[in-house]
Regions:
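Transmembrane-helix motifs of polytopic, lipid-linked glycan transferases
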Residues: 11-20, 163-188, 227
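Multi-pass, polyprenyl lipid-linked donor-dependent membrane glycosyltransferases
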Residues: 47-52, 168-174, 196-232, 246-258
Length: 333
């Protein structure tokens, strides 16, 4: 009986669509059904390679369905408005859901309890102190050097609640749409293409998923990397220095991202002088922070890279050496 009902429904839909006979409607239904079926399949079986294959198929069908539609021209203001709406929706969706999880007491002490306590100490003393991180009063910077957190402090002064941190984190990620838009326009992409890139940005699972582990300094990385890339592309000294310093302030290992970006602009000869500046600043910052954390803090947690530290030295420079000398092993790991 179920099969008979299924066949009758298919026949009825086919007859209705035959009378409508709209070319775009066919493609809309094809794209929608493929996306729904593909998403349901990934939910049922979320193995990595199966998910990649399903995404490729859904992407190919989407390109086939909307390829001709991308030829229409959008003006600047509607494009900016659409991107702004995407950013607001991302902030509300991610910020509110993570806030609801916190308000339902689903937030763990590690790491959200640590950061909530740290911001309360920063509000009262301007020092990033915690007592629950290592069973005693100490500066969080002894564990991870992340002065970038002070950018959130003014908002925490006004609204002293952990919810402020979660909403602020979502807004920070959404702010990456601004440099993404500027980079796309610099490369003379169409407004329709810019919107698609922006849509990919907000729908990329890693953008929102990390927020559901609550607050973390790494959420600053993406927008700051994009801002630094844009500053280097524009060949501006002051913005390049400012965004380099902001990126370095995210964490003790953030110089790796800045150094790689600087190295890219050197090797590609797109901006050798400023790429060299970013690279040198990153190396100096990394050495300085690593030294002070080893001497006055709890070290740089290099044990996380033990699979790359082949000589047992515990040095992160060995990691860099291993990556250069054995790139195949790097890909394997």
């Amino acid at each position: 009986i179920k099969m008979l009902v299924y066949i009758l429904v298919i026949v009825a839909v086919f007859i209705i669509l035959t009378f409508i006979n709209k070319h775009k409607l066919d493609k809309i239904l094809l794209m929608a059904s493929t996306m729904i079926y593909g998403s349901a399949a990934i939910i049922q079986d979320n193995k990595f390679y199966f998910s990649i294959g399903a995404c490729i198929i859904m992407g190919a069908v989407t390109v086939y369905c909307v390829g001709d539609w991308l030829r229409f021209k959008l003006k600047k203001l509607p494009t900016i408005a659409i991107i702004a709406i995407l950013g607001i929706l991302f902030t509300l969706f991610t910020g509110l859901l993570t806030s609801f999880k916190y308000l339902q007491h689903w937030a763990p002490c590690y790491d959200f309890g640590i950061f909530s306590q740290m911001f309360n100490y920063m509000k009262e003393t301007l020092q990033p102190l915690t007592t629950c991180e290592r069973d005693g009063l100490l500066s969080h910077f002894a564990v991870h050097f992340s002065p970038i957190y002070y950018l959130l402090l003014p908002f925490f002064f006004i609204f002293p609640s952990p919810v402020t941190l979660l909403m602020g984190q979502a807004a920070i990620i959404a702010s990456g749409l601004i440099p993404l838009y500027l980079i796309c326009k610099r490369h003379k992409l169409s407004n329709a293409a810019v919107i698609l890139f922006s849509l990919c940005y907000v729908l990329l699972p890693s953008m929102a998923n990390g927020c559901f582990f609550f607050l973390h300094e790494n959420k600053f990385l993406t927008p700051l990397i994009l801002w630094l890339a844009f500053a280097l592309e524009k060949n501006k000294w002051i913005p390049s220095v400012i965004f380099t310093l902001l990126l370095l302030a995210v964490k003790e290992d953030a110089p790796v991202y800045a150094a790689v970006l600087g190295l890219y602009f050197i090797v590609s000869r797109r901006n050798i002088s400023k790429g060299a500046l970013v690279f040198v600043l990153s190396i100096i910052y990394f050495i300085t922070v690593s030294y002070f954390m080893s001497k006055y803090g709890l070290g740089t947690m290099s044990y996380r890279y033990d699979n790359f530290i082949y000589d047992g030295s515990g040095s992160l420079f060995t990691v860099i050496k291993a990556v250069i000398l054995n790139p195949i092993y790097t890909v394997h790991e």
